[in-house]
C-alpha cells in the first residue's frame, strides 16, 4: 500500500500591488455610460478576481512549473489565491461589507464614478474605421490592492518554487487586466509579507488556525517582508527589447477626451490619480496631472510602421496594381509588420461569426501620467465659405489644447518581443517610426493637421542611444 503523503508545510504570502498605470478589469458587461464596465465587489468597489490572478501567474510559468504548482488533469492545484481587494486611504484592505462612512471617504467615494477612456480606430485614410469607436471604464492609477497566496507542500525544499512565482510579479512586462497592449495594466509590488509554517509544530499549527480569511485583518504570523529578496530573483527580460523615448513638445499638443466643457467644444484628456505617502493615500486632481495615453502613441506608430515597411519592401501604387492588389491589402492588420508587432483581431470565418487568425500584439507600453500643471490654451476656429468670405453656419468651434512649455515629458518606455523583430525589414521599419517621432516628423495626438503634437527628443534601445543626444 502506498504511503500517504503529508502536506504539512504552508507557504503564505500577503502581497500589496499598486497600479502604475490605469487598470481595466472588465466585467464583460455594458452600461449606459460605457461599452465596457469594470468588475465591482459587494461594496461597489473595484477588485481583481482570484481567477484573473491565477491565470496571469500560470501564464508566467513554464509548462513544468505550471503542472507542479497549479496542477493538471491528474492532480489539483497546490496554490490558493484570494481576490485582490482595494485599500482604503489608511492602507487597510476593504474586505467584507464596509461601513458607510468608509465608503463615503474622499478616496473610496472616487470609485463610484470612474474615468471613461474614449477610443477610436483610425484607418489608413485618416478617418475613423466603421465600428471602430468604443470606450471603456478604468480604475485610477495609484490604486492599491491586497491579496494572499498560500502554497501547500509536503517538502520544505519547495520554498524556492513559491518565491520564484512571487518574483514574476516584479517583471517589467507583467500586466493585469485587459488593454495591456493599449497602456493599461502595469503594476508595482509595494510589499510582500511572507511566512513558512510547519503544521507538525504545535505552535505553528495554532498560529495557522488562528489566521482569519478576511484580508482586512492583519495576521501576526507575517514577520518578514521579502520584497528585496524577490528583486534578486526577478526574471530577466531577454525575450523583450526595451525602447525609451524622451520627448519635448514644440508647443501645443492635444490628446482628446471626447468631451467638451463650458469653455471649449473639444478638450484634452485629464484624469485624477492616487498618490501614496507611506500608507496614506491622497487624490491628485486631474487639473494637476499631465496624461499621454499610450493608445495615441500606439496608433500613430502603427500607421507609420506600415508606411516604412511598404517603403522598404517596395510596395508602391504601381507594384500593387501590377499584382492586382489595393492599398487595403498592405495597410492595417494586412500589413505584415503591423500584424507582427500590434497583432490582429482576425477575420470572420466563412461559416459565420467566429473570428479566425487572431493574434496578440507584441508591443507593451503604458500610459504616462505625471503631477505637472499643464497650461491650457483656448484656440478658436472657423471655416470660411470660399464664395462669400463669411463663416459657414455651424463651423465655428473652440478647442482646448495643452501647452508643453518646452518641458520634457516623462519617459515613454516600450517593450517589444525580440522574436517579433527578427525580420530585418520589420525591425528597420519599427525603429524608423520611432525616430520619426523624435525628429518631429510624426506628430502625436489630435489636431496634427493644425500643427499640434510635434515633439523632438531622443531614442534608446536597451540603454544604447539610437537617435538624438
Please report, for each region that a protein language model flagged, where it lies by residue:
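Small/polar/charged residue-enriched interaction surfaces, especially the RNA/DNA-contacting tracks
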Residues: 1-469
Amino acid at each position: 500500500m502506498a504511503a500517504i503523503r503529508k502536506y504539512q508545510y504552508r507557504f503564505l504570502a500577503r502581497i500589496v500591488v499598486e497600479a502604475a498605470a490605469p487598470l481595466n478589469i472588465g466585467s464583460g458587461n455594458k452600461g449606459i455610460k460605457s461599452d465596457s464596465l469594470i468588475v465591482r465587489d459587494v461594496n461597489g468597489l473595484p477588485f481583481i478576481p482570484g481567477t484573473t490572478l491565477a491565470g496571469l501567474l500560470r501564464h508566467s510559468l513554464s509548462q513544468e512549473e505550471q503542472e507542479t504548482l497549479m496542477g493538471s488533469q491528474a492532480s489539483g492545484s497546490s496554490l490558493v489565491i484570494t481576490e485582490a481587494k482595494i485599500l482604503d486611504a489608511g492602507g487597510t484592505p476593504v474586505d467584507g461589507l464596509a461601513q458607510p462612512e468608509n465608503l463615503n471617504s474622499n478616496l473610496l467615494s472616487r470609485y463610484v464614478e470612474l474615468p471613461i477612456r474614449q477610443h477610436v480606430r483610425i484607418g489608413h485614410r485618416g478617418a475613423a474605421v466603421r465600428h471602430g469607436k468604443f470606450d471603456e471604464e478604468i480604475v485610477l492609477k495609484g490604486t492599491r490592492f491586497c491579496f494572499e497566496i498560500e502554497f501547500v507542500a509536503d517538502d520544505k525544499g519547495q520554498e524556492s518554487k513559491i518565491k520564484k512565482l512571487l518574483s514574476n510579479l516584479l517583471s517589467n512586462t507583467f500586466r493585469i487586466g485587459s488593454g495591456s497592449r493599449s497602456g493599461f495594466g502595469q503594476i508595482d509590488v509595494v510589499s510582500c509579507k511572507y511566512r513558512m509554517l510547519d503544521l507538525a509544530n504545535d505552535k505553528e499549527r495554532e498560529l495557522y488556525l488562528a489566521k482569519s480569511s478576511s484580508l482586512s485583518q492583519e495576521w501576526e504570523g507575517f514577520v518578514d517582508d521579502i520584497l528585496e529578496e524577490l528583486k534578486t530573483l526577478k526574471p530577466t527580460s531577454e525575450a523583450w527589447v526595451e525602447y525609451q523615448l524622451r520627448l519635448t513638445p514644440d508647443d501645443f499638443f492635444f490628446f482628446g477626451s471626447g468631451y467638451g466643457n463650458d469653455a471649449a467644444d473639444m478638450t484634452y484628456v485629464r484624469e485624477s490619480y492616487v498618490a501614496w505617502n507611506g500608507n496614506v493615500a491622497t487624490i491628485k486632481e486631474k487639473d494637476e496631472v499631465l496624461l499621454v495615453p499610450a493608445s495615441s502613441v500606439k496608433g500613430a506608430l502603427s500607421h507609420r510602421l506600415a508606411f516604412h515597411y511598404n517603403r522598404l519592401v517596395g510596395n508602391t501604387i504601381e507594384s500593387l496594381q501590377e499584382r492586382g492588389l489595393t492599398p487595403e491589402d498592405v495597410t492595417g492588420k494586412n500589413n505584415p509588420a503591423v500584424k507582427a508587432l500590434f497583432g490582429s483581431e482576425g477575420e470572420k470565418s466563412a461559416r459565420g461569426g467566429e473570428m479566425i487568425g487572431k493574434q496578440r500584439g507584441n508591443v507593451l507600453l503604458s500610459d504616462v501620467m505625471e503631477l505637472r500643471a499643464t497650461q491650457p490654451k483656448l484656440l478658436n476656429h472657423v471655416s470660411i465659405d470660399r464664395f462669400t468670405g463669411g463663416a459657414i453656419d455651424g463651423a465655428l468651434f473652440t478647442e482646448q489644447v495643452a501647452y508643453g512649455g518646452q518641458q520634457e515629458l516623462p519617459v515613454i518606455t516600450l517593450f517589444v518581443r525580440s522574436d517579433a523583430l527578427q525580420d530585418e525589414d520589420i525591425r528597420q521599419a519599427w525603429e524608423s517610426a520611432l525616430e520619426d517621432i523624435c525628429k518631429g516628423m510624426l506628430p502625436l495626438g489630435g489636431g496634427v493637421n493644425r500643427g499640434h503634437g510635434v515633439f523632438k527628443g531622443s531614442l534608446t534601445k536597451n540603454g544604447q542611444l539610437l537617435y538624438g543626444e
